[in-house]
Amino acid sequence: MKLTPHSREWYARLARELGGYRHPWTRVLDGPDPELTFDALLAERLGPGVRVLEAGCGHGPDAARFGAQTARWVAYDRQPELLALARDNAPHAEFCLWDGRGAVPDALRGPFDLIVSRRGPTGVIGHLPAVAAPGGRFLYVGPTLEVPQVPERLVAVGWTIHGEWRVSVRAWTPRWEDWVTRCEWMGEEARQEDWETRATARGLPYQEERYVVLAGAE
């Protein structure tokens, strides 16, 4: 049965078949991973006294990689199958099942010095005034060069953008099946004509894009 991309059932299948929230297509990058900007900004803001809230943690790769460098790493996701993997991958972190709607659960109230989201839900922005400590920061990376709801929602809660980065790296999908899967993931149309006219021995080129933003209440 074909599942709707980004539906709960679709994420459950990713957890079951891929062991986490991972790109289900093969890609080859011509340069550094565009998410390295987010990684660098995150790493330089961690420390033994820093309390972190992660929105949309998936199977917990960031909690596993960075959590031990903090005073507390708390994360939430709406998908129970992914949270089960996250708890195994990062036993030192705290995880909560939540879809970002309604009142913030007590376990997520913080306060937190850093709120992060790696291609996760932007709805967390509406909760920043409730969960952020004085001087807290919000760090986000999205899957395209423009994610207009992020600056719009930051303005709505009175937060200021301190920095924006747009990174684009050429990538290749080596097979037609990879291109179809990538387009489904991104909500784009996979056209056979594009493959037939533009694909080379390396596959079809496209731009792997990221939008990174750092914001604060002042």
Regions found by a protein language model. Name each.
Residues 105-114:
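A short acidic, Gly/Pro-enriched loop at the edge of an enzyme's catalytic core
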Residues 125-137:
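A short glycine-rich, Lys/Arg-flanked "PGG" loop and its adjoining helix->strand segment in the class I
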Residues 166-218:
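Conserved Class I S-adenosyl-L-methionine
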